[in-house]
A protein has these predicted regions:
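Domain-scale activation on soluble regions of proteins
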Residues: 1-163
Length: 163
């Protein structure tokens, strides 16, 4: 997304900062939930319970993936790729714990979330968020690939046993 904008004209895009951050954060959350629904060994009602009790908690969702998805498909949680994805999830989660900083200007007590004027590098932050989404999508794709292979092996075995 970031590459599509004119590098010289980022000053006019300051109004895009919060929507960009919100959309990427929401994408990260939905990708994690997708992994849980599609690749977890839990029953659908158990997955729904996990997702409902951890609605916007990116770190908790990633922990459930580490415990309930990665071991099934023999994905190593100590792999640098997965460790970095988890570290990036922690960074994003610690900045926006309940998915409201980018959605609303104030909290429930009518206090502004951003009291200080901070300057963020639009391109760097966008690249960071996009990389995180791509990393989680990569984990999902690898788990799906391995899930398909296991299903194919099971079908071959069942076919072999029937003959």
């Amino acid at each position: 997304m970031i590459e599509e904008f004119d590098q010289e004209n980022f000053s006019g895009l300051s109004h895009m900062f919060y929507p960009m951050c919100y959309l990427y954060r929401n994408d990260v959350e939905l990708l994690l939930k997708t992994i849980l629904f599609k690749c977890s060994s839990l029953r659908i009602d158990e997955v729904c319970k996990v997702v409902h009790s951890n609605k916007h908690k990116i770190v908790k969702l990633f922990e459930y993936i580490e415990q309930g998805v990665l071991p099934i498909y023999e994905l190593d949680a100590q792999d640098d790729f997965i460790k970095n994805a988890k570290r990036y999830c922690n960074i994003l989660h610690n900045f926006d714990l309940d998915s409201s900083k980018f959605r609303y200007p104030i909290n429930k007590l009518c206090e502004p979330y951003m009291r200080l004027i901070r300057y963020y590098d639009f391109v760097e932050l966008g690249t960071f968020l996009e990389s995180l989404c791509n990393a989680i999508d990569g984990i999902h794709n690898e788990a799906e690939y391995r899930k398909d292979i296991l299903a194919e092996i099971a079908a071959e075995y069942a076919n072999y046993m029937n003959d």
